[in-house]
């Protein structure tokens, strides 16, 4: 088994790290750079930063904090938020990001994925997918502009179909953000993640629902994901990353130490 990755997620809004529940009611957690440094020191394998309102407000990530993060940490990090062109992606990579993630802009223009891959290589192109389980139709659907509840909208895509589409177009990784589980700390959506794992040939990162160390163990053992992303359990000090890695090792799940 390849080493599994533990990835703290930092949602950014107006220059601060925030956290909501099911993509709503965000509260301020802290400052970007100190939190990034803390997680790097605690043993995170990489970090993901989402400027959650950038796409909905038709702007792009603030490059100033990207460069400050790059100066402080020595682990890979990925940035997302409003990146809709080669030039914007190039700027963020030049300021120190190791990967760029695209979500809503790719839904608006799927050809963006291929263009980014052609320019920078598959290895640094991550696609974020905000997936919502619709009980009425018993289906998983993709939503767009989820960082601003007033702008959030449904798309034409079923989650499985969009996962297949973004792979065809050249993404290097997929982060599956399960909206129903987000922030409630009741566990990852193992059923949905297992379904997506079957059709996902690139690294798959689980996002949404972590509340205990056992939840991480289950998502690696049952859903076979490559990495687990979490926010509130790390922000609130519920789980220490080094202790989590020790726990996973005791259950024969390798991580990077």
Curated annotation (Swiss-Prot):
BP GO annotations: L-histidine biosynthetic process
GO molecular function: imidazoleglycerol-phosphate synthase activity; lyase activity
Pfam families xref list: His_biosynth
The keyword Metal-binding is assigned to this record: no
Cross-referenced SUPFAM superfamilies: Ribulose-phoshate binding barrel (SSF51366)
Pathway the protein contributes to: Amino-acid biosynthesis; L-histidine biosynthesis; L-histidine from 5-phospho-alpha-D-ribose 1-diphosphate: step 5/9
Chain's role: IGPS catalyzes the conversion of PRFAR and glutamine to IGP, AICAR and glutamate. The HisF subunit catalyzes the cyclization activity that produces IGP and AICAR from PRFAR using the ammonia provided by the HisH subunit.
Record-stated family: Belongs to the HisA/HisF family.
Protein name: Imidazole glycerol phosphate synthase subunit HisF
Provenance organism: Shewanella woodyi (strain ATCC 51908 / MS32)
Gene: hisF
